[in-house]
Regions:
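Surface-exposed extracellular loop regions of Gram-negative outer-membrane beta-barrel proteins
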Residues: 2-6, 15-46, 173
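Alpha-helical repeat-solenoid motif detector
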Residues: 8-10
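Short, contiguous, pocket-lining structural segments
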Residues: 14-20, 51, 159
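Exposed, low-structure sequence patches enriched in small/polar residues
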Residues: 36-38, 44-47, 52-173
Length: 173
């Protein structure tokens, strides 16, 4: 059980936001020969002015080939991702103080890839994933402010595709 809460008091006014995310994530791991599988689910709640509850899959499988030289893997999961004023302000220091902060809901994250090691010093990971996201934020100009030098947030539903390639070389033992 994972819980986290935070409260934001912004500026001199009465703007305050309190939210909490509660997570319950039971799962089972199994291993048979070179196959490793995880099957479970994640129940999460996004509690702010009103509470919303989500049920996400949490499954992953990998299979070791050639003594861990190649490990194909795939999975499917979801998550409630916390957005904080500090995180948003680091991305854009010109953010208006009176923004409505919503957590991003990762409804589905399907991913697959191949990782492995060619030697004790050299590892790699190549993967792709497709995310379906609700409340994904974008920065837009704040046309209401007097000198229009601030940004507001707008939230949209998006589908995001990511391609990742990693190569690691570790010199030493």
């Amino acid at each position: 059980l994972d819980t986290s809460t935070y409260e934001i008091n912004i500026g001199q006014g009465l703007t305050a936001q309190t939210t909490a995310i509660l997570r319950f994530n039971p799962h089972i791991y199994t291993r048979k020969n070179n196959l490793i599988a995880k099957v479970g689910f994640s129940m999460q709640s996004d509690i702010n002015d009103n509470a919303k509850f989500y049920l996400f899959p949490d499954v992953e499988a990998s299979y070791s080939l050639f003594n861990n030289v190649f490990i194909p893997y795939a999975g499917w999961k979801g998550n409630v991702e916390r957005n904080t004023f500090n995180k948003l302000r680091i991305e854009n220091p010109f953010l208006s103080e009176d923004i409505d902060i919503k957590n991003t809901i990762q409804r589905s994250n399907l991913y697959a890839g191949i990782r492995g090691s060619m030697s004790s010093n050299f590892t790699f990971n190549i993967s792709t994933n497709i995310d379906r996201l609700d409340n994904f934020y974008f920065h837009i100009p704040d046309t209401i402010s007097s000198i229009e030098n601030k940004f507001q947030l707008t939230y949209e539903k998006v589908t995001r595709t990511t391609i990742l390639g990693e190569v690691t070389y570790q010199n030493g033992e």
